Swiss-Prot record:
It is found in: Endoplasmic reticulum membrane; Microsome membrane. It is a peripheral membrane protein. Heme b binds at residues 92, 121, 366, 427, 429. PROSITE patterns: CYTOCHROME_P450 (PS00086). Changing residue 65 to E: In AH3; no activity. Changing residue 355 to H: In AH3; salt wasting form. Changing residue 238 to E: In AH3; salt wasting form. Its main location: endoplasmic reticulum. Its EC number is 1.14.14.16. Transmembrane segments: none annotated. It comes from Homo sapiens. The leucine-rich hydrophobic amino acid N-terminal region probably helps to anchor the protein to the microsomal membrane. This is Steroid 21-hydroxylase.
Length: 495
C-alpha cells in the first residue's frame, strides 16, 4: 500500500518540479525532453536510452525520478563535454548513497571536482604508475599462473568462472595495494566477501531509488541499514591496513601503493590553494582501487569467455596466434605486456569485448560546474549529465555492424581510438592501465593453457541481467576448461 501511494505521489512531485524548472529555464535553448518519469524501470537502461536517440537525437533530457538529467549517447557529444569542455563537466552530483560510500567525499570516483580532488587523483595515479611500476606485471603474472594451476586441477569440470575471476582480480588489487603480507595473514577471503557485500547491497533497487527520490530516505529502509553495516566492515579492514603500514613505514621506501600514498600525504601540498591531503584520502583511494578494480575487470573477463564460447572460430584463431608466437604447448612462455603488439588479434578481441560490454555502460553521473553548452544546446550550471558509453559504442554512424561481435574491426589502423570503454577526460578511469594489463595477461594465459568449452548443450546467454546498476552482469553460467593437449576438441569443431 505504501509503495502504491509513493508511485501515485511521484508524478505529482515530478510535475511540480518540472513546472519550477520550466519557469527558471524558459529562456534557454535546452536539449529536447523525452517524456515520462519511470525510465529507471527499463530492464536494459543503456539500450533503452540509445533507442530514444531515434526520436530525440544523441543528446536529450529526461526525468529519472525527481531528477532532470541530460543523456549523451554519441562519441561526439561525450567528447565535447568530457574532453573539450572538461572543466565545465567534471563535477559530481551529491546523492545520499555517494555520501555514505565515500565518507562524505574524500574520494576519487564519487567526490566533486576541486583542487584537492585533483591533488588526490595525481597522488593515486602516481602510486599506480610509479609506486608499483616494477611490481605490477610480475604480480599479475604470478597470481594468474596460480589461477591456471587451480583450474588445471579440475580438468573439464564445469566451473563458475565469474567468481574465480573475481577472486583473482581481488587478489591482484590487494597485493598491489596492501602488499604480499595479506597472503600470510589469510585475509583475502574476508576482503573478497566484504567487497562483494558492499557492491551487492549498493546496487539493490531499494538503495538506488533513494538517490532519485531523496525523501524516501526518511522511510524505514533495511537496505540502507545493510549498506551502512557493509561500509563499516569495509572501513575496518582498510583502517587495519593503514595502521599496520604506518607502524612499519620506512621513509623513502615503499612496498606497495599504500606505503607510497602514506608518504605522499605526509608531504606539504605543492599546488597553491589545494589544501592538504590526509589519511582519509589514502583510505578512500584504497577503497576505490578495491571496489573499482575487482568486479569491473572480472566482469570483462567473464564476458570475453562468453563471447568466445559463442565464437569458437575466434578462439581457435587466438590459440593459433599464441602458438605461432610462443610455440605450441609453451605454457611457461609469455609475451611481455610491452610487446603486446605481437598479438594483434588478442588485442582486437579485448577491444571488441570492451566495446560491446564497456567497463561501466552508463558512466557515473557528472555535474556541470558552470553554465555550458553541448552541440549548440544550453546546459545550465548544476545539471546532471549521464554519458551512455554503451550507446556510443553501438552508434551506427560510427561502427559498422555495431551489434555484432567482430574483433577484426580493430585490426584496421585507427579503429581503437573510437572506443570509450574507460571513459575520457578528467574523470577517465585511473585503473585503466592495470585493467588492460590484467585482461591481456589473463586471457593470454587462459587460452595458452585451456580450450574453453560449454558446460552443456546450451551456450550461456549474451543478454545481461536485467536492471543492472553499475556494471553489465551476465546471466549465471559455467564453462569447461579443457587443458590443451589432452585430446580435447578444437574450439572450432562441433561437439
Amino acid at each position: 500500500m505504501l509503495l502504491l501511494g509513493l508511485l501515485l505521489l511521484l508524478p505529482l512531485l515530478a510535475g511540480a518540479r518540472l513546472l519550477w524548472n520550466w519557469w527558471k529555464l524558459r529562456s534557454l535553448h535546452l536539449p529536447p525532453l523525452a517524456p515520462g518519469f519511470l525510465h529507471l524501470l527499463q530492464p536494459d537502461l543503456p539500450i533503452y536510452l540509445l533507442g530514444l536517440t531515434q526520436k530525440f537525437g544523441p543528446i536529450y533530457r529526461l526525468h529519472l525520478g525527481l531528477q532532470d538529467v541530460v543523456v549523451l549517447n554519441s562519441k561526439r557529444t561525450i567528447e565535447e563535454a568530457m574532453v573539450k569542455k572538461w572543466a565545465d563537466f567534471a563535477g559530481r552530483p551529491e546523492p545520499l548513497t555517494y555520501k555514505l560510500v565515500s565518507r562524505n567525499y574524500p574520494d576519487l570516483s564519487l567526490g566533486d571536482y576541486s583542487l584537492l580532488w585533483k591533488a588526490h587523483k595525481k597522488l593515486t595515479r602516481s602510486a599506480l604508475l610509479l609506486g608499483i611500476r616494477d611490481s605490477m606485471e610480475p604480480v599479475v603474472e604470478q597470481l594468474t599462473q596460480e589461477f591456471c594451476e587451480r583450474m588445471r586441477a579440475q580438468p573439464g569440470t564445469p566451473v563458475a568462472i565469474e567468481e574465480e575471476f573475481s577472486l583473482l582480480t581481488c587478489s591482484i588489487i590487494c597485493y598491489l595495494t596492501f602488499g604480499d603480507k595479506i597472503k600470510d595473514d589469510n585475509l583475502m577471503p574476508a576482503y573478497y566477501k566484504c567487497i562483494q557485500e558492499v557492491l551487492k547491497t549498493w546496487s539493490h533497487w531499494s538503495i538506488q531509488i533513494v538517490d532519485v527520490i531523496p525523501f524516501l530516505r526518511f522511510f524505514p529502509n533495511p537496505g540502507l541499514r545493510r549498506l551502512k553495516q557493509a561500509i563499516e566492515k569495509r572501513d575496518h579492514i582498510v583502517e587495519m591496513q593503514l595502521r599496520q603500514h604506518k607502524e612499519s613505514l620506512v621513509a623513502g621506501q615503499w612496498r606497495d601503493m599504500m606505503d607510497y600514498m602514506l608518504q605522499g600525504v605526509a608531504q606539504p601540498s605543492m599546488e597553491e590553494g589545494s589544501g592538504q591531503l590526509l589519511e582519509g584520502h589514502v583510505h578512500m583511494a584504497a577503497v576505490d582501487l578495491l571496489i573499482g578494480g575487482t568486479e569491473t575487470t572480472a566482469n570483462t573477463l567473464s564476458w570475453a569467455v562468453v563471447f568466445l564460447l559463442h565464437h569458437p572460430e575466434i578462439q581457435q584463431r587466438l590459440q593459433e596466434e599464441l602458438d605461432h608466437e610462443l610455440g605450441p604447448g609453451a605454457s611457461s612462455s609469455r609475451v611481455p605486456y610491452k610487446d603486446r603488439a605481437r598479438l594483434p588479434l588478442l588485442n582486437a578481441t579485448i577491444a571488441e569485448v570492451l566495446r560491446l560490454r564497456p567497463v561501466v555502460p552508463l558512466a557515473l553521473p557528472h555535474r556541470t560546474t558552470r553554465p555550458s553548452s553541448i552541440s549548440g544546446y544550453d546546459i545550465p550550471e548544476g545539471t546532471v549529465i549521464i554519458p551512455n558509453l554503451q550507446g556510443a559504442h553501438l552508434d551506427e554512424t560510427v561502427w559498422e555492424r555495431p551489434h555484432e561481435f567482430w574483433p577484426d574491426r580493430f585490426l584496421e589502423p585507427g579503429k581503437n581510438s573510437r572506443a570509450l570503454a574507460f571513459g575520457c577526460g578528467a574523470r577517465v578511469c585511473l585503473g585503466e592501465p592495470l585493467a588492460r594489463l590484467e585482461l591481456f595477461v589473463v586471457l593470454t594465459r587462459l587460452l595458452q593453457a585451456f580450450t574453453l568449452l560449454p558446460s552443456g548443450d546450451a551456450l550461456p546467454s549474451l543478454q545481461p541481467l536485467p536492471h543492472c546498476s553499475v556494471i553489465l552482469k551476465m546471466q549465471p553460467f559455467q564453462v569447461r576448461l579443457q587443458p590443451r593437449g589432452m585430446g580435447a576438441h578444437s574450439p572450432g569443431q562441433s561437439q
